[in-house]
Amino acid sequence: MTRRTAFFFDELCLWHAAGPHALTLPVGGWVQPPAAAGHAESPETKRRLKSLLDVSGLTARLQLRSAPPASDEDLLRVHPAHYLERFKALSDAGGGSLGQDAPIGPGSYEIARLSAGLAIAALDAVLAGEADNAYSLSRPPGHHCLPDQAMGFCFFANIAVAIEAAKARHGVERVAVLDWDVHHGNGTQAIYYRRDDVLSISLHQDGCFPPGYSGAEDIGEDRGRGFNLNVPLLPGGGHDAYMQAMQRIVLPALERFRPQLIVVASGFDANAVDPLARMQLHSDSFRAMTAMVRDAAERHAGGRLVVVHEGGYSEAYVPFCGLAVIEELSGVRSAVRDPLRDFIELQQPNAAFRDFQRQRLEELAAQFGLCPAQPLQAAR
């Protein structure tokens, strides 16, 4: 079944520059200048995704849109004024370090506002009934950003800013955020840790970023207790680990919460060739997770689903993973075939690893008080 999928993109988002880096290391001292892309959070992963959509013909089947930048009113619902002022001043001065692993260049402030604006508009389009679902190709990403501190290539909390705008404009009460970026969604967690109107679920590589963080015991506080679920997965985990996490934790949690809107923080850095992680997913892993969460949205949220782009640092492979997600959202299949899918499938963990990971997931599900998921059927 084909669906009305809106795709939010603006070329200016690709113009954010982090300055001279080799992967994530500032050039200087013992760090040599890079021969190619430079900083890991390069525009090329997003540019090549958009190019693959265009060349495959899929763009023509989507509602291609841009959006205005996030307003001060939008941003101030999440970020204090002094943070906006500090960010703008550093950007206007030519850039520098805004926080841990958060370098910016000239114009980054305005581009980050636009990135958040794309996410806001994506939620607006779905909640207004203009699209069945939406994908926001936001850059810079947002899920590590704290209210008053940039972190991990993130400068505004794009998804939180969009959710708070949606609450103000559309009166939506219950929103679920599923973060499958390989790095923990610590910014989203911090913003909603004491609230029960947003369910935050993070699937991430155990101990990857923030360095050493697992988070399984961090389930929220006060009214938010039980509404923050962290699912740390063992390094080296692959397709089976994520399918088990979806079936055993994510889907039952959505069933219990019954959101009116689901937002996915979609990083593609759990893919098997990403330079900043050690997981083993291929494009069909992201396709399968999208199908699961889409069916959950149709069951609980009237189909209202928005996917917001986060990380993913393999220029060669991110486009195939992103294409798979957008094909699944839209119900339109292109002629593109993933050239690494079968190779990655052969590298999947052995049975002993899979059994150990499954046991850990069972223990987490019991800790979270979750019953096994029933098979989801799309709403008719």
Swiss-Prot record:
Result of altering H144A: Loss of enzymatic activity against both acetylated and trifluoroacetylated lysine substrates
Phenotype when the gene is knocked out: Growth of a mutant strain lacking this gene in the presence of both acetylcadaverine and acetylputrescine is comparable to growth of the wild-type. The deletion mutant strain shows a 25% increase in biofilm biomass after 24 hours of incubation compared to wild-type cells.
Gene Ontology molecular function: histone deacetylase activity; hydrolase activity; metal ion binding
Consequence the record notes for mutating H143A: Loss of enzymatic activity against both acetylated and trifluoroacetylated lysine substrates
E.C. no: 3.5.1.-
Active site (UniProt): H144
Keyword Transmembrane helix part of the UniProt annotation: no
CDD domains: HDAC_classII_1
Biotechnological and industrial applications of this entry: Could be a suitable photopharmacological target for photopharmacological antimicrobial chemotherapy using photoswitchable inhibitors.
Co-factor binding comment: Binds 1 zinc ion per subunit.
InterPro entries per the UniProt record, alphabetical: HDAC_PDAC (IPR050284), His_deacetylse (IPR000286), His_deacetylse_dom (IPR023801), His_deacetylse_dom_sf (IPR037138), Ureohydrolase_dom_sf (IPR023696)
Residues that coordinate or bind Zn(2+): D181, H183, D269
Cofactor(s), by name: Zn(2+)
One Pfam family matching this protein: Hist_deacetyl
Keyword Secreted: no
Site residues by UniProt (Polarizes the scissile carbonyl of the substrate): Y313
One of the GO biological process terms: epigenetic regulation of gene expression
This protein's UniProt keywords: Hydrolase, Metal-binding, Zinc
Documented activity regulation: Is inhibited by azobenzenes, stilbenes and arylazopyrazoles.
Enzyme class: hydrolase
Subunit text: Homotetramer; dimer of head-to-head dimers.
Its biological purpose: Probable protein deacetylase that catalyzes deacetylation of acetylated lysine residues. In vitro, exhibits high activity against artificial HDAC (histone deacetylase) substrates containing acetylated and trifluoroacetylated lysine residues. Is not able to deacetylate acetylated polyamines.
Family: Belongs to the histone deacetylase family.
Name of this chain's protein: Histone deacetylase-like amidohydrolase
UniProt organism field: Pseudomonas aeruginosa (strain ATCC 15692 / DSM 22644 / CIP 104116 / JCM 14847 / LMG 12228 / 1C / PRS 101 / PAO1)
